[in-house]
Amino acid sequence: MSALEQNIEKLNGHLARFQRSGILHRIAGADHAGGGGVFETLSPVDKSTICQVARGDAGDIDKAAKAAKAAFPAWRDMPAKQRKAILIKIAEGIEARAEEIALCECWDTGQAWRFMSKAAIRGAENFRYFADQVEAARDGQHLQSATLMNITTRVPIGPVGVITPWNTPFMLSTWKIAPALAAGCTVVHKPAEASPLTARILVEIAEEAGLPPGVLNTVQGYGEDAGKALTEHADIKAIAFVGESRTGSMITKQGADTLKRTHFELGGKNPVIVFEDADLERALDAVIFMIYSINGERCTSSSRLLIHETIKDAFESRLIERVNKIKVGHPLDPATEIGPLISEEHFAKVTSYFDIAKNDGAQVAAGGEVLGDTGYFIRPTLFTQANNAMRIAQEEIFGPVLTSIPFASEDQALQIANDTPYGLTAYLWTNDLTRALRFTDKLEAGMIWVNSENVRHLPTPFGGVKASGIGRDGGDWSFEFYMEQKHIGFATGAHKISRLGV
C-alpha cells in the first residue's frame, strides 16, 4: 500500500463520524443544532460532500456570547498556574491528534500533506508559547512621581470574537485563540464556512484538556449570518479577524455601534525584491517557496517578483524551469507540492487572471492552465513582461501565481514595491548591508525579511500596514489587544488638594 493509500485509509476513519453526525455548534460545553439549518462542506480534491454542517444564525451567536460572558469571571479569576496547565494540556492534545488534524485539513482545504502536517504541530507550539506567558500577562510598570506611586496592570478585556479563514485554518485558529485564553478572555469562534472540520477538533481537544464550559464556543456558518451577528453583539468586546481587506472594512462598520475593538490581519500583494548582488541560488529557492507553497493561499505569499534588469532574463529562465517541475497532485500524497484550490468560487477567481494577464499584455511564461476536471487543480503560474500598473500586480489573486516585474534602480524598486494598496510583508535579497538598512526603512510593510523567506519567531510582532491590517499579533503584542491597561495611583503622603466651596 502506497503512502497516499495509507493516508486515504486513515482519513476515511476520521471522517466517518462527521459523515454520520455532521458538525454541530459547540456552546457552553454542549452540542447545538442551532436554528439556521445546515449546509454542506465539500472537498476541493474531488468536489465530493464531506458532511453537513450547522449553519449558525443570530440566535446561535447570542447563545454563544452569553455563554462566554457567563464563563468569563471564573476564567479571568482562575489562578494563572491553573490556566497555564490547561493550555499545556491543550498543546499535548493537539500533538496527540496531529495526524488526524492534518489529514482532515488536507481533505477539507486541498492543502498538501507536507505543509499541513507541520501546521498542526505549529498549532501546539502556539498554545505552549502562550501558556508560558500566562503568569506574566498582567505585569505592569511602577512609575513614581513626587506625590504618587503609580502602577499599571493589565486585565482581560472580556468575551471576544475570533473569525478565522480557510487557509491553514487550524494553525491560524490557535494563533488567535491561544493568546486570548492566556490573557483570561473567553472566546466565541466563527471558523470559515469552507473549512469547518478542524475547528470542531480544536474545541474537543480544549474541553478534554479541562477548559471549562463556555470559555471556548464554536459557531459554524457564514459571514453574512453568524459573522455579522458576532461583530454586532454587545457582549463581545473585541473581534480578531483574519481574511480579506473588504471584509475587515465591513466588520469595522458592523462593530461601530458597540465600539468594538478590532484586530485585522488582512490581504497582501507582497514584493520579493532581488538585486544583482544577491545570493541568487538562495533567492530562487525563497521566491519559489514563498508563492507556490501552501497553494499560494496565504497572506504572506510574495506574489510580486521585482527583479533587477541585469539579471532578469537568467533568473526568469531558471524560475520557469523550476515552476514547471512543481508537483501538483492529491494533497494526501507526501510527494505533492501543490494541491487543489479551496472552492469553486475561488478557483473561478484565480483562473480568471489567466485571461486578465494576457489582455493586459503580460506573458504566461509557465502554467496558466487548469488540470483535470475532478477537483480545483491548476498549474503553478508565472507571468512575465509585466508592469506594476497591471491588475495582476495590484490585486490579491491568492493562488500559486507569481508576477515578475523588472526594475533598473534602487529608487525604482522602492517605488514599485510601495505602489500597492497593501503592506503586509516584503522580502529583500541583497548582500549590501547599507542598501538593506536604507531600503527596509522606506518599505511600506509591517514585516520584512532580508535574505530570508518568511521565518516566524513567536515573540515578534505580526501584522501589516495600509489595507493589510490593524494591530499586531505575537508575544506581548497579542496581550495588548486582548487586555486593557489599568492605572492605579497611590498617594505617598498628604499632598495638597485644592479646596472648593470653603
Residue ranges and their predicted role:
Residues D139-R282, F407:
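Rossmann-like NAD(P) dinucleotide-binding subdomain of oxidoreductase/dehydrogenase enzymes
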Residues M1-V45:
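Hydrophobic face of amphipathic alpha-helices that form TPR/SEL1-like repeat modules
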Residues A238, R246-N387, D411, V450, ...:
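ALDH superfamily catalytic-core signature
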Residues K47-A137, T147:
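Glycine-rich loop-to-alpha-helix module at the N-terminal edge of alpha/beta enzyme cores
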Residues S48-C51, I236, I273, K327, ...:
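Conserved C-terminal structural/oligomerization subdomain of aldehyde/semialdehyde dehydrogenase
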Residues I50-G56, A71-D77, V162, V272-F275, ...:
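Short, well-ordered beta-strand elements within core beta-sheets of diverse protein domains
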Residues L24, A30, D139-T147, Q220-G221, ...:
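Short gly/ser/thr-rich secondary-structure transition/capping motifs
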Residues K47, R83, E105, F127, ...:
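Residue-level signal for inorganic ion chemistry
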